[in-house]
A protein has these predicted regions:
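Mixed-charge (Asp/Glu-Lys/Arg
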Residues: 1-135
């Protein structure tokens, strides 16, 4: 399996675009991209044909640092304003199963499955997969 450190490898904008590209392939959807700067809680968005709103937010954080719970709580407030049907959080860093559970609980009801919390290990797994349309 690949073992890229996305925090050190990519600049914030590059990581956001990379995350969007990976999620588009994984989910087989087209995500709208937005300009740099304050994003009101969404780095990318898809409105499905049946009107569902899927939001993707990417966070480029170092593995060495503590998980930024304060920042995640602020993102949850933004999600509460948007009220997406589904929220996909892409992290450049890895998390423990307990941290993933707490993130999912924090973002309830928007994060609908553990797969909606994509970590650095997950991203490396997608890159190492032979299945181009990974889902």
């Amino acid at each position: 399996m690949k073992n890229y450190d996305f925090h050190h490898l990519l600049e914030p904008v590059e990581f956001r675009e990379f995350a969007r590209d990976i999620i588009q392939v994984r989910e087989k959807i087209r995500l709208e991209a937005f300009r740099e700067g304050p994003d009101q809680g969404m780095d990318a968005r898809c409105i499905t044909p049946d009107g569902k709103c899927i939001v993707m937010q990417a966070k480029r954080w170092a593995n060495e640092s503590a998980l930024r719970w304060k920042e995640l709580r602020e993102e949850k407030k933004k999600a509460d304003r948007i009220k997406p049907d589904r929220y996909i959080l892409v992290l450049s860093r890895d998390v423990s199963p307990e941290q993933k559970k707490k993130i999912r609980e924090l973002f309830h009801p928007y994060i609908i499955a553990d797969e909606d919390i994509v970590t650095g290990k997950d991203l490396n797994g997608y890159l190492g997969s032979n299945d181009v349309g990974y889902a």
